[in-house]
Amino acid sequence: MAKPYYVKFEIPENLVSPIYESLRVAVETGKVKRGTNEATKAIERGVSKLIIIAEDVEPPEVVAHLPIICEEQKAAYVFVPSKQELGKALGIEVICAAAAILDSGDAQHIIDEVIASIAKIKDGKPEAKSEPEAKSEQ
């Protein structure tokens, strides 16, 4: 299955588990908001440490705005493959499309590692470039 259009970068498999773990720890020792609306508010207010967005959300328009406003607000964000697993990591029995970590609690070191890894992934891939640089005529 192809990735949804709102997924801006690929998350390596070895990073998915630490993302879920950071959520579990932050739920117990910090402060986490659940759901797309709460994540949106956290981004707009500038209080989020990390935004987690599920890739398998239907319809994709539910969460498609999150990466855009994260970029505008310079908020850290990541993607996880499953809304079901995102819900489990949050300690709820239902699916969840997005979550925002507001206070990382004891998960700060995990979140710092995740954010550093994501920064490397994003830096390694030019964003918003539609044409190869070889086409320059100078």
Where do the model's predicted regions map?
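Extracellular/luminal Protease-associated
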Residues: I43, S48-V62, P67, A75-Y77
